[in-house]
Amino acid sequence: MAPIILAVGAGIILLLGTGHGVLTLLDTIRPRYFTPSDEGVRLAMEGVRTAMQHGKPVSSKGNLWRSWLGFNLSHSLGIVVLGGALLVFALHHFTAFAQSVLIQCSAVGITSAYLVISICFWFWVPTAGFGVALACIVMAAALA
């Protein structure tokens, strides 16, 4: 039962990361999801660089809006890697998960961090998702 519970939690994390990445990629074509509600703000973001971009940016498209999209894509990748790793443990290496306090604590700690960040900065969908995923991971670890 514990591997199934871990797989459910991992699947939720994978879904959150993949969904975030897809919506971000769609925003590169037509901004709708992670764009400011005031279009003027996005246009202003397109007109400036970040303070860290001293001199010439790597790309001619280097601006705050593109940096924002890149951050969102790299953020998605991290979440997908976490969910994917947990799914591999659930489906193929559950014994390693069950026997390793380090793996269990890492899974709980990283997912907890995403939950806290979500509560502080995001909206209800990722908060609910990370909350349920965390509960699944904790239950799987307790049952292991």
Residues of each region from the PLM?
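Membrane-helix boundary connector in multi-pass membrane proteins
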Residues: H93-A98, T111-G129, A142-A144
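N-terminal signal-anchor transmembrane alpha helix
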Residues: M1-D38
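Helix-coil boundary and interhelical linker segments in multi-pass alpha-helical membrane proteins
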Residues: M1-A10, V88-Q99, M139-A144
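Hydrophobic, membrane-inserted alpha-helices
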Residues: A85, A107-I117, A133-I137
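Core segments of alpha-helical transmembrane spans in multipass integral membrane proteins
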Residues: S37-V88
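Juxtamembrane transmembrane-helix termini
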Residues: L23-P36, V88, H92-Q99, C120, ...
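Membrane-water interface of alpha-helical transmembrane segments
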Residues: P3-A10, G62-W65, L69-N72, F97-Q104, ...
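Residues within membrane-spanning alpha-helices of integral membrane proteins
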Residues: P3, A7-G17, S76-I79, G83, ...
